[in-house]
Amino acid sequence: MDATVFTKCERCKQPVYEKDLRARFNVCPNCEFHYPLPAPERVRLLTDAGSFEERDGELAAGDPLGFEGYPDRLRSARKKTGLGDAILSGVGEIGGRRVALAVMDFRFIGGSMGSVVGERVARTVELARAEGLPLVTVSASGGARMFEGIYSLMQMAKTSVALSRFMEGSKPYISILTDPTFGGVTASFATAADIIIAEPGARVGFAGARVIEQTTKERLPEGFQTAEFQREHGMVDRIVHRLALKGDLERLLGFVG
């Protein structure tokens, strides 16, 4: 991409060089707005250089329900992102400490959790348990993948059972919530951690605010479902700027890893 290309920030509306945005891992240099970050870039941000080894990349989603248009959506998402599904998982080092890591990618069909995403999360958890590693996940998801129906919903149980076994050990599970994290991902592995971190301004919840208001016929509080609101009400432990995440993880792993 041409380094002279500008984009307008979604929040402050100021022009930003694309190269400056990329250099700051998609954080606006003017107002610190956190844009979504592709999974490969997230891995580069969090792990020590050259330490990440992908696992289970061969897994690929099928079309179990014969849902019209789903195979085309999968092909398009794979071409757009270069990923097999909405997740990148494996083993890497953070501050010299080996960890099991699973990172979601919202670009791939809204980061939705289907059978492959759930399986890779579960396998990452099981790997951490088998090898005695700390576990780190990064969520960015609209929820369950409707194209897979009950197969998608089953992933909530699968990941939760894997985590319950992992929690019998002594290694920590750190979950990072990014914008947006919703639906079945929120209701399963994303909020079942020892330590829950969120990026500033991240939207976190189960159903969207508009759906809740239409159902309850009530106006929601200002800032409802933001990371800041969730921290005030006990769902999030800490809010950490994206560019400080690696250092924060290094300190936390030094204490509890």
Swiss-Prot record:
Task: Name any cofactors this protein relies on.
Answer: Zn(2+)
Recorded catalytic activity of this chain's protein: N(6)-carboxybiotinyl-L-lysyl-[protein] + acetyl-CoA = N(6)-biotinyl-L-lysyl-[protein] + malonyl-CoA
Which GO CC annotations does the UniProt entry carry? Answer: acetyl-CoA carboxylase complex
Q: What class of enzyme is it?
A: transferase
Q: Which Gene3D superfamilies match?
A: 2-enoyl-CoA Hydratase, Chain A, domain 1 (3.90.226.10)
For this UniProt record, the keywords arranged alphabetically read as follows:
ATP-binding, Cytoplasm, Fatty acid biosynthesis, Fatty acid metabolism, Lipid biosynthesis, Lipid metabolism, Metal-binding, Nucleotide-binding, Transferase, Zinc, Zinc-finger
The EC number of this protein is 2.1.3.15
Q: Which GO terms describe its biological process?
A: fatty acid biosynthetic process; malonyl-CoA biosynthetic process
MF (Gene Ontology): acetyl-CoA carboxylase activity; ATP binding; carboxyl- or carbamoyltransferase activity; zinc ion binding
Describe, by residue range, where the zinc fingers (C4-type) fall in the chain: 9-31
What residue stretch is flagged as signal peptide?
none
The superkingdom of the source organism is: Bacteria
Q: Which residues participate in Zn(2+) binding?
A: C9, C12, C28, C31
The cofactor note reads:
Binds 1 zinc ion per subunit.
Annotated compartments: Cytoplasm
Q: What does this protein do?
A: Component of the acetyl coenzyme A carboxylase (ACC) complex. Biotin carboxylase (BC) catalyzes the carboxylation of biotin on its carrier protein (BCCP) and then the CO(2) group is transferred by the transcarboxylase to acetyl-CoA to form malonyl-CoA.
Q: How does it assemble?
A: Acetyl-CoA carboxylase is a heterohexamer composed of biotin carboxyl carrier protein (AccB), biotin carboxylase (AccC) and two subunits each of ACCase subunit alpha (AccA) and ACCase subunit beta (AccD).
- Family stated for the protein in its record: Belongs to the AccD/PCCB family.
Q: Could you tell me what this protein is called?
A: Acetyl-coenzyme A carboxylase carboxyl transferase subunit beta
The record lists the organism as Rubrobacter xylanophilus (strain DSM 9941 / JCM 11954 / NBRC 16129 / PRD-1)
Identify the coding gene: accD
